[in-house]
Swiss-Prot record:
It catalyses: ATP + H2O = ADP + phosphate + H(+). It comes from Mycolicibacterium gilvum (strain PYR-GCK). PANTHER family: HOLLIDAY JUNCTION BRANCH MIGRATION COMPLEX SUBUNIT RUVB, PTHR42848. This is Holliday junction branch migration complex subunit RuvB. ATP binds at L34, R35, G76, K79, T80, S81, E142, D143, F144, R185, Y195, R232.
Amino acid sequence: MGRFSNADGPGDDADEREVTPALTVGEGDIDASLRPRSLGEFIGQPRVREQLQLVLEGAKNRGGTPDHILLSGPPGLGKTSLAMIIAAELGSSLRVTSGPALERAGDLAAMLSNLIEGDVLFIDEIHRIARPAEEMLYLAMEDFRVDVVVGKGPGATSIPLEVAPFTLVGATTRSGALTGPLRDRFGFTAHMDFYEPAELERVLARSAGILGIELGAEAGAEIARRSRGTPRIANRLLRRVRDYAEVRADGVITRDIAKYALEVYDVDELGLDRLDRAVLSALTRSFGGGPVGVSTLAVAVGEEATTVEEVCEPFLVRAGMIARTPRGRVATAQAWKHLGMTPPAGAGGLGQVGLFE
């Protein structure tokens, strides 16, 4: 269990967690410097890479644009990197926007009108695009044209505008939130899975080389297994461990240095942080293992219900620590054991398989 207290509280705000898969403030430039530039450099997701290579090579051989591409999966797995790689492999320009930024049809029309033939348009969080913009996107994806409405009321007229043939790459963390008509217009859909520890070790070795960090193999394995199967988290933890190694040691990251550093940053051997352990502690100590509703659990740890449900719970469920039941959240036998406690009778049937076991 390491040197963590079972009674750890939630600590820092959820947005400041070292193990959040989302980009944090000021992280964008560093994240960009570590991005792979080609499919050959991209580590992990072998099926997606193979399928994408076929799609892109086929389009290049035909001298046309590939089908529109939808990339789905949890944050931090490389969807934006793949969009950049797609444009690079095609020798095309990449235009970047996001679903929340496209609030009106006019916003999208302006972007589409500036595309040149062969451009790649990347829309991140495409499930959050506003309905008027989405409906305009249908026609652009299918027929490479848009209808722009001029005026209001009975006097309004629709002016058709041609759009240069382009490839849309959409990224989403919630593919189920896409409307059927939008989803059906993507010719190729790829789902990205969490990484295995061995793949994360390769990611870390590559990043260490780029950043000039001396990282031992055992140290890389130590960081990888605490990274929640997510390259972005692995790279962030690598930078935190580097800071520790430079300040408290000689700058070389050994396994012991990695362990000590990650304990300082409250990331335990399974990748749980203070907030995760606070949720498990409340569930086991305050509510006897459950079942308990997420709102009640959130009050117990001093967080918003959405934070517990959307930030903590997905990983705890995936790691086999919490089970969702019709009556509420229940701690599994593995959760009790991780906190150094004896699970009560009946907890053993609620999933004891860990994330990478």
